[in-house]
Amino acid sequence: MRLLEERIKKDGQVLGEDVLKVDNFLNHQVDPELMAAMGEEFKRLFEGAPITKILTVESSGIAPAVFSGLAFHVPVVFARKHKSLTLQDNMYSATVYSYTKKVNNHISISKKFLNENDRVLVIDDFLANGQAVEGLLEIIDQAGAQLEGVGIVIEKTFQKGRELLDQRGIHVESLARIAAFEQGEVVFLDENNEN
């Protein structure tokens, strides 16, 4: 998605060898016009899929997921990372490793929001090692729901997340695919003449 790639080039900040900071428009301050465009693009990419729910993990996946839910006209459910006093029993849960924060998170979703009749599209902000998506897939399996696909805002193709999902035959669409970080700059996959 050219609009997103341009925004990453303009406002993204490469930290070290494998971290991209996009807090200016995605995961701290949110650009609603960009989010709306991303929601419409996910709608186009998964056109025809009988999606009944959008699923993500709090907190950075919420904005793109909500705008995708708006485009699909379906509810959005986000997995919570912290136990809540209002969410005690009847939960689906999984443990996921946060690549950026280097910690394990226990994620959970109330059973009343996901069931065997749901056809789910997972939306998340980043795909690196695939841990967040794997956790959501575990929850989808627990619910007996059916996965329709995974939509990723920014994919780091130099990490193993896509490979893990491809091995499972999962339909994955990423709006921006990063091939590398070179000298503090983002190199997108299409700039490397790769597909």
Curated annotation (Swiss-Prot):
Catalysed reactions listed for this entry: XMP + diphosphate = xanthine + 5-phospho-alpha-D-ribose 1-diphosphate
Q: Say which domain of life the source belongs to.
A: Bacteria
Q: Tell me the pathway.
A: Purine metabolism; XMP biosynthesis via salvage pathway; XMP from xanthine: step 1/1
Q: Name the top EC class.
A: transferase
Q: What is its main location?
A: cytoplasm
Positions of xanthine binding: 20, 27, 156
Could you tell me the keywords of this UniProt record? Cytoplasm, Glycosyltransferase, Purine salvage, Transferase
Chain sites annotated for binding 5-phospho-alpha-D-ribose 1-diphosphate: 128-132
Please give one Gene Ontology molecular function term for this protein: xanthine phosphoribosyltransferase activity
Annotated Gene Ontology cellular components are:
cytoplasm
- EC numbers listed for it are 2.4.2.22
A GO biological process of this protein is: purine ribonucleoside salvage
The record's note on quaternary structure and interaction partners says: Homodimer.
The record's function comment reads: Converts the preformed base xanthine, a product of nucleic acid breakdown, to xanthosine 5'-monophosphate (XMP), so it can be reused for RNA or DNA synthesis.
Q: Which family does it belong to?
A: Belongs to the purine/pyrimidine phosphoribosyltransferase family. Xpt subfamily.
Output this protein's name: Xanthine phosphoribosyltransferase
Taxonomic classification: Bacteria, Bacillati, Bacillota, Bacilli, Lactobacillales
What gene, per UniProt, encodes this protein? xpt
